[in-house]
Amino acid sequence: MSARKYFGTDGIRGRVGQGVISADFVLRLGNALGRVLTQGRSKRPLVLIGKDTRISGYMFEAALEAGLVAAGADVQLIGPMPTPAIAFLTSTLRADAGVVISASHNPHYDNGIKFFSAEGEKLDDATEAAIEAALDEPFHTVESERLGKAIRTRDAIGRYIEFCKASVARGFTLHGLKMVLDCAHGATYHIAPMLFRELGAEVVVIGAAPDGLNINAGVGSTHIDNLAAKVRECGAHLGIAFDGDGDRVLMADDQGNPVDGDDLLYVLARSWQASGRLTGTVVGTLMTNYGLEQALAALHIPFQRAKVGDRYVHQALVEGGGTLGGETSGHLLCLDRASTGDGIVSALQVLEALGRDGQSLREALASLSKVPQKTVNVRLDGGTAKAIVEAVNVQQALQQAQAAVQGRGRAFLRPSGTEPVVRVTVEADDAGLMQDTLDRLSGAVRDAA
């Protein structure tokens, strides 16, 4: 496959008003998608458009709508909704594609576009390539009688809440549980508190007053200390933090200890194994903590690593017949319940597992011992990151580092695909060994750079 011109690993993203994240480009993007979808069809395709709460979403929603309608596609405007909700609604409303306007955990001045197929899954490479090819063609407006129509959907919230509830057992309840929800002033701000209260929880809410500019600002899964402090302050049993578009979830236990995606993956894998729900291999990424790998091995649970990015975790799960995977950042995939990473659904799976096992979150994690891990970004003065990583002296230093932590951790290098940086990561069961190995390996990379 040739290199993508516009698409990254998770759609298109950047600074608003710069490069491709502009109204005129998004207008053409909508038109390109519409032309791809109308090819070979006798009836107008249907496209759903959702967004998070950042202020630029209004501009890009209008641009996408205009481009799609001009190409002859019908549009349903969903408004502010979690990214996974758009994936679900695209499938259940029999749409031909879904589009989300969001930059996930990024600040308000960034935005992006994500796409879903008719099945509610991320677009395949061939479809992305077709959209990119159409983008390089002239904007096209069909004859008046073939123009699409746009309507605003009113029942999307109720549909998605019922979908989330259906992901847990019918008798599942949260009565007696006090929780803190941090909605990152993002797309879950109205849905998550409503859902967890309907299930019986006592809910303390923070980060649920979006103004278009405060999304992810000191709140949400990228600022977990805020959640941890609130849990301690109000004596909650646990806390749950989402990111701006609701596809990530992190937690805090009753003492305010941060709980990341690796921790949650362990809770689910162990519980699902005991209940017979776990199938296939559990999938993490290159960044998944070595301690989790060891803990799963002790439980005889097969584990594999994919490249960083939830699309690669998803690909590995599908290829291996597994249903459970995720990233340290909180992208969790429960493919027997949702077609994509869903923060709310994943949180419900964890709460259901804790209830079934009769444990608090802290108790469920008592048997997991993660190892110290640290990543250093080495900025390059010249040359490409890939060339630096492949340099003979750097490869020799990497082999020495891997030998130093063999059986006790890992050492690896990741060239950035977007900036002149090599990411140096070392983890080991001893903090001193980890730091010494990291210093030596990052020093070798700096010398080569």
Swiss-Prot record:
InterPro entries: A-D-PHexomutase_a/b/a-I, A-D-PHexomutase_a/b/a-I/II/III, A-D-PHexomutase_a/b/a-II, A-D-PHexomutase_a/b/a-III, A-D-PHexomutase_C, A-D-PHexomutase_C_sf, A-D-PHexomutase_CS, Alpha-D-phosphohexomutase_SF. Mg(2+) binds at S104, D243, D245, D247. CDD domains: GlmM. Its cofactor is Mg(2+). Activated by phosphorylation. GO terms for cellular component: cytosol. Pfam families: PGM_PMM_I, PGM_PMM_II, PGM_PMM_III, PGM_PMM_IV. PROSITE patterns: PGM_PMM. The modification Phosphoserine is found at S104. Its EC number is 5.4.2.10. GO terms for biological process: carbohydrate metabolic process; peptidoglycan biosynthetic process; UDP-N-acetylglucosamine biosynthetic process. Catalyzes the conversion of glucosamine-6-phosphate to glucosamine-1-phosphate. This is Phosphoglucosamine mutase. The lineage of its organism: Bacteria, Pseudomonadati, Pseudomonadota, Gammaproteobacteria, Lysobacterales. The gene is glmM.
